[in-house]
A protein has these predicted regions:
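N-terminal intrinsically disordered, cationic/polar leader segments
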Residues: 14-157
Length: 157
């Protein structure tokens, strides 16, 4: 909890600073060192996100089933600018003994709303948390980032 408060406080300070001062995008990005980004991302990696609740999968002998969840409303903050990034996350997996309860999966995604996290780290965090909760036979995470600055980004984990 302390880590989340630290991150939110830092984001608020950055937003307050942005309101008070005129700046160019270049100046804003240059204020943040790669060391600061690394420290911030390491703190986020340790954060305990809401649990993804699970239910028993009653057809575990069916090893060929593939389940796909797509959530087009995932929002997280860009750690460089504080601007919200919008994602479509797709989870493609082969179930083992458990499946996620979808309401808890949605609340899990909503918890990222105020977190400053890099795209690549977000895909890995979702993958790690989903594996830990659901223990799938196979898992693929696709994170499609809304186009920003003319660059289309897709992370596949």
């Amino acid at each position: 909890m302390r880590q989340v408060l630290w991150l939110l406080k830092r984001q608020k300070m950055n937003k307050d600073k942005m309101k008070k001062e005129k700046f160019t995008f270049k100046e804003k990005v240059e204020e943040i060192s790669s060391k600061q980004i690394k420290e911030q991302q390491e703190e986020i990696k340790k954060l305990k996100m809401p649990n993804i609740q699970t239910m028993d999968f009653l057809y575990e002998d069916n090893k060929e089933s593939e389940i796909v969840y797509e959530y087009p409303e995932l929002i997280a903050l860009c750690p460089m600018t504080g601007i919200p990034d919008i994602y479509t996350v797709k989870i493609i997996y082969t179930p083992n003994k458990k499946v996620p309860e979808l309401k808890s999966l949605r609340f899990y995604f909503l918890a990222y709303k105020d977190l400053p996290i890099l795209h690549e780290h977000l895909a890995n965090k979702i993958s790690e948390d989903f594996k830990k909760a659901v223990e799938p036979r196979k898992l693929r995470i696709e994170l499609d980032v809304a186009v920003r600055g003319g660059i289309r980004t897709k992370i596949i984990k």
